[in-house]
Swiss-Prot record:
Span of the signal peptide: none
Effect of a null allele: Abnormal morphology (dumpy phenotype), slow growth, sterile and in severe cases embryonic lethal.
PANTHER family: EUKARYOTIC TRANSLATION INITIATION FACTOR 3 SUBUNIT G (PTHR10352)
Localization per Swiss-Prot or TrEMBL: Cytoplasm
Listed name of the protein: Eukaryotic translation initiation factor 3 subunit G
Superkingdom, natural source: Eukaryota
Keyword Protein biosynthesis: yes
Domain RRM: 182-260
Similarity field: Belongs to the eIF-3 subunit G family.
Pfam families in the record: eIF3g, RRM_1
Organism per entry: Caenorhabditis elegans
Lineage: Eukaryota, Metazoa, Ecdysozoa, Nematoda, Chromadorea
GO CC terms: cytoplasm; eukaryotic 43S preinitiation complex; eukaryotic 48S preinitiation complex; eukaryotic translation initiation factor 3 complex
Amino acid sequence: MTGINAMAPAPEVVSWAEAVEQDNAPHIQEGADGTRTETAFTEVDGVRWKVVTQFKVINKRVPKVVADRKKWVKFGSCKGEPAGPQVATTYVAEEVDMQFTRNRAGEQILDVQEDKQTAKTTSREHCRHCKGNDHWSTHCPYKVMYQLDEEADADKDTEKDRMAMGMRPDGRQIDRNRSDENTCRVTNLPQEMNEDELRDLFGKIGRVIRIFIARDKVTGLPKGFAFVTFESRDDAARAIAELNDIRMYHMVLKVEWTRPSN
């Protein structure tokens, strides 16, 4: 038995205007996978164009805030347009997930270099030996060499100062041997500390006869050590006991007996 599929008769075209309008009307075809193909004709500057658009409607669950955002009223170039993206103002493309890889080893090297550069420009660290700004004097790799030179220069400067200042402030002669016995050697002295501050500090212990701060001959900056002479040896001993290992600025003072000149 043979079956014949009867096709619906084509609508009757009354006039040519209706034929043109029917020909220009969009035609929508829906595929098996839910994809819709819309074919339309448009005329621009006397040229007829065929526009084919494919789209697929997908229903998915979204957060409530996303759904509410789709209800916002459009503005600007999209003012008055219906919901959804518009071809004239919105370009819809595939979502691409980007993953940024990080070279941790290279970042660590860069961080160390930046830290060193920052330390050179902003650090308060300062070495009184090599004049570097990346470490303290106690961690200077040339500390031993500089200390030997400083002690040699200090002995020379102290001897000259003793010869030039052989008188007490009141004009009386100072016994050199007695002066050596009553003198304290102060090391690890901050560069910010001057003679007045040193006199105020040691003057609380007893009467100070003389204070000498060793300075660089070229720059005039303190070398980091000084000599304080008391009138009494007992005061010098108390100064060593009370002022040794106290903190001044960023340094810790070392107060001890001076070495005999002979």
